Amino acid sequence: MPRNTMVYEILGPMFFAETNDYLAFTHEKHKNVLILRMRDVPAMDITGLESLEEAYKTCQKKGIHLLLFHVNEQPRHVMEKAGFVEKLGEENFCENIDVALAKAATFDN
């Protein structure tokens, strides 16, 4: 794994979600990529999306690239409908961990 990278797995639906768990990773020094594995997120509501958007804003402020992988159909639809896919950038949605890690390596500091 690239030394500049943090990987966090979100488990379960993102309803009434809080950002505290994965935002804690943004305090690590010398890290400029946060990869979120979302394979085990079958569903997301607006509060889950707001949590993800808050994480994205925090990452932007700290110069951290946010990458997502294994995003399921329903959460992806919520993200698309709300404009989050466009905001984050389609290129930051990765098919699997190998693709995400390879992309993270291009941001090595």
Each PLM stretch: what is its role?
Residues 1-109:
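Structured cytosolic domains appended to multi-pass membrane proteins
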